[in-house]
Each structure stands twice: as structure tokens, then as C-alpha cells.
Amino acid sequence: MLNFLSAKVGEALYDHQWDAKRNAEGTKTVDLFDGFDTITEKEITAKTISVANGNMVNVDPSTINSTNAVEVLKTIYRAADPHLRRLKTQMFVTPSIYDAYCDDYKTTTGAIPYNTQFKQTFVEGSENRCEIVPLSNKAGSKYIHLTTKQNMLVGVCQEGDDESVAVEKHEAFRLLFVMTMFYGVEFETISKERLLVAGKVTA
């Protein structure tokens, strides 16, 4: 039972890895920490992620569909800093954008877009350096993130007595599952050499 409940907590944390927004008064998983999209929004507001800084490109993901997805994702990739383009990267997208890319690619070329050997889909023209990664927990996101795996940090505390899992009985026929833990996400760096965000730029 503990394993099952712990797994459900893990699923909830994963579901909100992007859209979580820290609210000290909240009681839901989405209130526990700032997710990657929330961090991105704060950095855009602070102008540390911007077109001028080279770590953002003005592309509205909501405009991507099955007739333009290939060209738009190529445009995003080509806007990345040369240092970033030299690295093995991932382009994190919503499932709908991935589906649009696959449909557009097949319509345009008559072929499937993914590498049959590795079952991975790469941005056309990236020489298999930029993998398109659809994430169910990114559905509805206003951003596309192009970066390296190493730049996406997930932090937990696994030492000491600060984390605990327990089942407590406070009244008849009722058990409480109590978990105390530390959890958070962050970009290792938002420099243009490691990160490019695609999103709609507002004045």
C-alpha cells in the first residue's frame, strides 16, 4: 500500500513539473513548487529570458498545426545559439505539437519522421542532434523549450530525517497517509548556450 501511495505522489509531481506555481497557502500538488513554465514566465518578466538575450524566439506555439509544424520547429532550432546547436539537445513540446509535426512531415515528404532504429523523432536538418520530446505533462503549455537533459534539474532531499513516509491512525476505520519531502525543479542555467525558449513575445 505504501508503494502504491508513494507512486501516486510521484505521478502527481510529474503531472505538474511544468505548470506548478508555489502557493504557501495551497493544499494541492500544483501549489508545492514552481514548475519549469512558471520559472520561465518569471524569467521573461525579469527580462533575463528574452529575444535580446538570445535565449528566446518569438514563436507562438498555439499557431503550430499539421500544415506548418515542420517549418516552425526548424525555425526554432535554427534560432538557437551555435554553441547550443552543437550539442545533443531535446525540444520539449506538447503532444499536440508532436502529432502536428508527424502529420506535416508525412504529408510533405511521404515518409515517417522518426528514426526507426532508435524510435526517436529529430528536427529535420538537425543531423539527429535535436530530439523532439512530447510530454503529457506539458499539454497546454505556452512555451517550447530547447535545451539539454543536463540543464533540466529535479531536486529532492534523500538524506537525513527530513523526509518521511508514514501511515497514521487518528480515528476508527480511518488511516492517513503522511509524506514529508522536499521537491523542486530548476534550470541549471538560462544562458543562450544552453537554453532557447519559444513563446509569444508581448510588448
Task: Report the location of each language-model feature.
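Alpha-helical scaffold segments that mediate packing/assembly in large oligomeric complexes
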Residues: M1-T75
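Short low-polarity hydrophobic stretches
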Residues: L5, M91-T94, I132, F177
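Short glycine-rich, low-complexity/disordered patches
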Residues: D15-N23, R85-T89, N115-Q117
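A glycine-rich phosphate-binding loop feature that marks nucleotide/adenosyl-phosphate handling sites
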Residues: R22-G26, Q90-I97
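Sequence/fold signature of self-assembling virion shell proteins
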Residues: F33-T67, R86, Y98-A203
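Non-catalytic alpha-helical scaffold/packing segments enriched in small hydrophobic residues
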Residues: V72-I76, I97-A100
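Short, basic/hydrophobic alpha-helical segments
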Residues: K74-L87
